[in-house]
Amino acid sequence: MASSASARTPAGKRVINQEELRRLMKEKQRLSTSRKRIESPFAKYNRLGQLSCALCNTPVKSELLWQTHVLGKQHREKVAELKGAKEASQGSSASSAPHSVKRKAPDADDQDVKRAKATLVPQVQPSTSAWTTNFDKIGKEFIRATPSKPSGLSLLPDYEDEEEEEEEEEGDGERKRGDASKPLSDAQGKEHSVSSSREVTSSVLPNDFFSTNPPKAPIIPHSGSIEKAEIHEKVVERRENTAEALPEGFFDDPEVDARVRKVDAPKDQMDKEWDEFQKAMRQVNTISEAIVAEEDEEGRLDRQIGEIDEQIECYRRVEKLRNRQDEIKNKLKEILTIKELQKKEEENADSDDEGELQDLLSQDWRVKGALL
């Protein structure tokens, strides 16, 4: 009976294990950290919710250290490299656009000259192949006789020479085949065609077509700018070389020496170093503060877990004391019930003795055999 009473627990009470409590605390901590997610294009979370930097490809221990990682030297160098590559790509695209614009003007002039020549040539072209070859020879001799110009349009006669040479080769092949079949008739036809071609050219072509002074080609607008840029670059390189050639301390005045050598003055250099030192110290302080904050957070969690363990132990002791109290109460109840039963039995026995005594006393003692 005592064992059954000790096995019973009070109704409506739930006993929490230490492992379950630890699991609940870790889950609560995970939920609190998940709410503070870093919103940054370089922040990346994996399936387990661990934070890492996508640019540096390095894991970050917690969200508290993200700002420290961003202010770090490695992350800033990666960001600077990314910005430099982006600016270089933009600069190359911007430099290629003006170059294509500058090349449009000579191409348009070339097309205009080609169209003018194409309109003039079909007007004087006869039906015979011999006349075309002679006219090509005359045009070729004229082009060779004209002096070449250094402008961009001086390339046009060379292009026309190639076309005329191809036409001349085709005409020579036709002429050779014609000479093999009809030598005499072709010779007479050639003389007649040459004379007729000269008459046609003299009648159709203008008077100043074969002038000795051809029109000057327009000057390309960007040629002078390129030369000026080259001269400016040479001057800058010479100046830089002369400044670098001077040794340190060439001038007595340190400020003049620094200005000529194109370096920072000693005072400015000291201020710059002091600013860099302060910046580095601030970064170190922020890192140390973040580390201290993380350690404090871990210590606080450890203290909370320790306090919870102590509370669990106290609850266990209270439960033990309550169980012991229940056991003692049950024992007392059993003892009291036993005593009450004993009293009842004694009372019953006393009442039986008294009844017998009364019976004896009520009988007549003088009667024979009354006490038997």
Curated annotation (Swiss-Prot):
SMART domains: ZnF_U1. Residues 78-126, 143-225 are annotated as: Disordered. The keyword Transport does not apply. A zinc finger (C2H2-type) spans 53-75. Residues 87-99, 194-204 have a biased composition (Low complexity). It comes from the Eukaryota. Residues 312-349 form a coiled coil. It is found in: Nucleus; Chromosome; Nucleus speckle. Disulfide bonds: none annotated. Residues 104-115 have a biased composition (Basic and acidic residues). Keywords: Acetylation, Cell cycle, Cell division, Chromosome, Coiled coil, Developmental protein, Metal-binding, Mitosis, mRNA processing, mRNA splicing, Nucleus, Phosphoprotein, Spliceosome, Zinc, Zinc-finger. The modification N-acetylalanine is found at A2. The modification Phosphoserine is found at S225, S351, S362. The keyword Nucleus applies. GO terms for molecular function: nucleic acid binding; zinc ion binding. May play a role in pre-mRNA splicing as component of the spliceosome. Acts as an important regulator of the cell cycle that participates in the maintenance of genome integrity. During cell cycle progression in embryonic fibroblast, prevents replication fork collapse, double-strand break formation and cell cycle checkpoint activation. Controls mitotic cell cycle progression and cell survival in rapidly proliferating intestinal epithelium and embryonic stem cells. During the embryo preimplantation, controls different aspects of M phase. Component of the XAB2 complex, a multimeric protein complex composed of XAB2, PRPF19, AQR, ZNF830, ISY1, and PPIE; this complex binds preferentially to RNA. Interacts with XAB2. Identified in a pentameric intron-binding (IB) complex composed of AQR, XAB2, ISY1, ZNF830 and PPIE that is incorporated into the spliceosome as a preassembled complex. The IB complex does not contain PRPF19. This is Zinc finger protein 830. It comes from Homo sapiens. The gene is ZNF830.
